Design a protein with these regions (language model features):
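Catalytic-pocket segment enriched in acidic/His residues
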Residues: 87, 121-123, 130
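Acidic/glycine-rich phosphate/pyrophosphate-binding loops and surrounding catalytic core
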Residues: 1-76, 80, 92-93, 97, ...
């Protein structure tokens, strides 16, 4: 959620402020978002295709909108799952289930070090997520809530 044409500057400013950028571009990691999942043959098949086409050094992250999507992503071998706009109650219940799944699944694809991330975080609800067991938060607040200086350059 960056300003067109200013992405690299906004990402750099965020980094200078102490933030860790999720990705600088689509080539940093494979991220399956809702449109990819809807367009494709599903999460499991998409992960299978990605594992056979991208370098093994690239991570595969799935943006899950439901608990069943998150579980499917873990079973299929995603390196990370972003729990997209889920309620705090759902997250508190789901995170331990996903952690348990990495220990008990018979799937040979399950990553034992799955990274669980949540979105929908802002300064007003950040403290609600402290004891949920998540690894990362994803927020666009530093970009979308920032005040910009109105400047221009004129030539004569």
């Amino acid at each position: 959620k960056t300003t067109p044409g200013l992405r690299i500057f906004e990402k750099y400013a965020f980094h200078c402020g102490g933030g860790i950028n999720h990705r600088l571009g689509l080539d940093d990691a494979a991220m399956l978002k809702e449109n990819h999942i809807e367009w494709s043959q599903g999460i499991s098949e998409s992960i299978k295709i990605l594992k056979n086409t991208i370098p093994w050094t690239k991570k595969i992250i799935v943006e899950a909108e439901t608990p069943s999507q998150a579980k499917e992503a873990v079973e299929a071998g995603a390196d990370g799952v972003l729990l997209d706009e889920m309620s705090i109650q759902t997250i508190k219940k789901l995170v331990p289930e996903l952690r348990q799944l990495t220990k008990t699944s018979s799937s040979k694809y399950v990553s034992k070090n799955i990274v669980i991330e949540v979105s929908g975080i802002n300064p007003n609800n950040l403290s609600d997520y402290i004891d949920t067991g998540i690894d990362l938060i994803s927020t666009s607040a530093p970009i979308t809530k920032s005040k910009w200086i109105d400047f221009s350059m004129r030539f004569s």
